[in-house]
Amino acid sequence: MTPQVASDSAVPWPRRLTQAVNIGHLTVGGGHPVVVQSMTNTDTADVVASTKQVAELWRAGSEMVRLTVNNAQSAAAIPRIAERLAMMGIEVPLIGDFHYNGHQLLADEPACAEVLAKYRINPGNVGFGKKRDLQFGQLIECAIRYGKPIRIGANWGSLDQMLAAQLMDENNRRKQPWDAAQVLREVLIFSAVGSAERAVELGLPRDRIVLSAKVSGVQELIAVYRDMAARCDFALHLGLTEAGIGSKGIVASSAALAVLLQEGIGDTIRISLTPEPGQSRTQEVIVAQELLQTTGHRAFTPMVTACPGCGRTTSEFFQELAKTVQQHVRDKMQVWKITHPGAETMTLAVMGCVVNGPGESRHANIGISLPGTGEMPVAPVFIDGEKSVTLRGGNIAQDFITLVDDYVERRYARFPD
């Protein structure tokens, strides 16, 4: 695929036209906003722990949550988890993640099949040998019976070995054989798209199918999805598999997904981070939201611009204020998204000295330019490009937060006084 030439406008390219897939109360693809999803790492059979983590992910902003369904106990737990979430007032589509035995679990636990909003199927391990087509067909029949969409998710860590061997043999007979990376890419794409077309032949509508083909290399992922997007009109789920821990996982996922999203490819995303010991699982949700927001695809919470600091900003106060303001607006968005729609598009600036402080603050809806080393101990505040007030004294942080809240009330209140 030849990359497009960017237009003069500083916006992402038009979204790729795909099938629109209804998943619970959400619609994925068909031009709808890119959806953020996540996955639990609890034992699904532990109803209390799994319900708690789904709720945490939902509160952080996950719009769909996937759970492992690997045995009879976990399948039986799904309806109980859904019931507890409903009692908590949480409406979030639950996705069942099936490998090896999904056909049997869905047949044995009809309540699980009914409650799940979508089934994730791995074409690389849905069945082996002669059983593959039979067990794949049973899964599709279940999706048709219960009116559920599916995601056919190929992964280079669990490739269909028979398909891989077949395509490698075909490649060896070429006059000009592809390199190993091209063959791998073809196996992934053929596995996903071919399985989807087989599902359609079995009677599953095209608008109940989402595809993914995940690898752990940035350039490989970009190449796979560009190729797959050119071959089909199915909605696509993006994710860099096994992205890793900490900053490496964040950077790798963002580097790959940002390119694809900019090209209009992708209808739902997950950031597959390895949590650090003791770290909340919700980080993957926050990173996904920030990726979509900083690239101009969606808005979730007011964005805070802050300078990195230099020798002019020896005080840590501006860093602490930037962190406090970011956490404040993120916490408030739980209420603001209902009472003050549009507040999520607001921009704020917390700057540390006079060099870029006033200018950057003028670009924001509301910004503060704190004094740097040797500057007067005053902090001018700019609102919608105009200097509004100068803050002094020991309550600058709280005074600025009050100004932010007042601004939100005046500009975004659903029912202004």
Curated annotation (Swiss-Prot):
Gene Ontology biological process: isopentenyl diphosphate biosynthetic process, methylerythritol 4-phosphate pathway; terpenoid biosynthetic process
The protein's name: 4-hydroxy-3-methylbut-2-en-1-yl diphosphate synthase (flavodoxin)
InterPro entries tied to this protein: Dihydropteroate_synth-like_sf, IspG_bac, IspG_bac-typ, NO2/SO3_Rdtase_4Fe4S_sf
UniProt-listed HAMAP family: IspG
A Pfam family the protein falls into: GcpE
PANTHER family documented for this protein: 4-HYDROXY-3-METHYLBUT-2-EN-1-YL DIPHOSPHATE SYNTHASE (PTHR30454), 4-HYDROXY-3-METHYLBUT-2-EN-1-YL DIPHOSPHATE SYNTHASE (FERREDOXIN), CHLOROPLASTIC (PTHR30454:SF0)
Pathway per the UniProt entry: Isoprenoid biosynthesis; isopentenyl diphosphate biosynthesis via DXP pathway; isopentenyl diphosphate from 1-deoxy-D-xylulose 5-phosphate: step 5/6
Residue numbers binding [4Fe-4S] cluster: C307, C310, C353, E360
Positions in coiled-coil regions: none
GO MF annotations, alphabetized: 4 iron, 4 sulfur cluster binding; 4-hydroxy-3-methylbut-2-en-1-yl diphosphate synthase activity (ferredoxin); 4-hydroxy-3-methylbut-2-enyl-diphosphate synthase activity (flavodoxin); iron ion binding
Catalytic activity: (2E)-4-hydroxy-3-methylbut-2-enyl diphosphate + oxidized [flavodoxin] + H2O + 2 H(+) = 2-C-methyl-D-erythritol 2,4-cyclic diphosphate + reduced [flavodoxin]
Function: Converts 2C-methyl-D-erythritol 2,4-cyclodiphosphate (ME-2,4cPP) into 1-hydroxy-2-methyl-2-(E)-butenyl 4-diphosphate.
Keyword terms: 4Fe-4S, Iron, Iron-sulfur, Isoprene biosynthesis, Metal-binding, Oxidoreductase
Organism: Xylella fastidiosa (strain Temecula1 / ATCC 700964)
Principal EC category: oxidoreductase
Catalytic activity, EC: 1.17.7.3
CC cofactor: [4Fe-4S] cluster
Record note on cofactor: Binds 1 [4Fe-4S] cluster.
Family: Belongs to the IspG family.
